[in-house]
Amino acid sequence: MDESIKKLPDLAIADLIFTVKLEGKTGTESYNKLIKEIETHKMLPLYKILVEQLKWTEDQGLVSKLKAENESELKALDNKITDSVENFGESEIREAYLAKSDFYCRIGDKDTAVEMYRQTFEKTVPLGQKLDIVFTLIRMGIFWMDHDIVTRNLEKAQSLVEEGGDWDRKNRLKTYEAVYKMSIRQFKEASDLYLETVASFTSTEFIDYSRFIQYLIFTSLLHLDRVSLKQKVIDSPDVLSVINDTPKLQDLLQSFYNGDYANFFGALAHFSDSIKGDRYLAEHSRFFTREMRILAYNQFLESYSSVKLESMSNQFGVSYDFIDRELSRFVAAGRLNCKIDKVSGVIETTRSDAKNHLYKTTLQQGDNLLNRVQKLSRVINV
């Protein structure tokens, strides 16, 4: 990571907040870590928000300590701005304003930070420095999951990049955009962005590489066809270098691709449960489980014109009743291209609408071509 890029705000703190909210109680290891981070970064505004949201008993001693530290630091920052305005040039004035903006961002005063960054942006000339401010605002928006801040600044960053942003910042923007799109269930767009940036990943101020690869696999499983999944993910040296950092992720990917459905179901259950603790993926856990089951069922059924329910249940390592209920539900919803004969216990596969349309179109085009050949033949004979 470029040393000039600060972890600001520190998104690991947002992860801690999410975990503490899930646990729903104080005194846990996560809670104690969070309080330590709040104290270290002097995050009084954030602490007050959490006290109100989570109904904590306010620690008056901590509040008094953080208030005094914030006031002292703010006074020094204001003095620095005054000194820069009176004695130095535009560059020093900008740096003083940036320091004050970073202060408000760090302590968790979102609204004041946004306003200070706006003022700093107006005093900034170099394109790269403007982009760095916008990137900080995107990270801050994602920290708070403030969709307005994120979307406005993603658009602004895109506009600035089109003016001539450097290669590294263009890639950085794609990573930020990928994570945000994934968080709002735009998985295909996120997958494309992850795959574009995997070989040139540098955004460690935002997300660590192992987690980036986990998200790449998560989105790619949902949207890539088998050939692309093999080429771009399974055989990717970048993916292989860290895939085992996430338990069961390798099993999930390989068992799905290889049609090892019993192991796939076990790995899917483990992975889906683990992402319930991820602030970006938690609300998509059930969706992912359902969609991956549908993909696996369709992949299995593509190999057969008909297959017994009992055979399929054995392949997936589940009971006959489970597979019967599951398939019936997805067939009724139009998600599986098959019919179930309840009497004989047989599944009969059918062409998808897309394949039916292609089949009919091909026949129609063939008929039209045949008619034209016959007409031409009659003309020649005459």
From Swiss-Prot:
Coiled coil (residue ranges): none
Domain PCI, first and last residues per copy: 186-354
Disulphide bond pairs: none
Similarity section: Belongs to the proteasome subunit S10 family.
Organism lineage string: Eukaryota, Amoebozoa, Evosea, Eumycetozoa, Dictyostelia
Record's protein name: 26S proteasome non-ATPase regulatory subunit 6
Pfam families assigned to the protein according to its UniProt record, in alphabetical order: PCI, RPN7, RPN7_PSMD6_C
One GO location term (cellular component): proteasome complex
GO terms of biological process kind: proteasome-mediated ubiquitin-dependent protein catabolic process
Source organism, top-level taxon: Eukaryota
Known function: Acts as a regulatory subunit of the 26S proteasome which is involved in the ATP-dependent degradation of ubiquitinated proteins.
A molecular-function term among this protein's GO annotations: structural molecule activity
Keywords: Proteasome
Keyword Secreted annotated: no
Signal peptide from the UniProt entry: none
PROSITE patterns according to UniProt: PCI
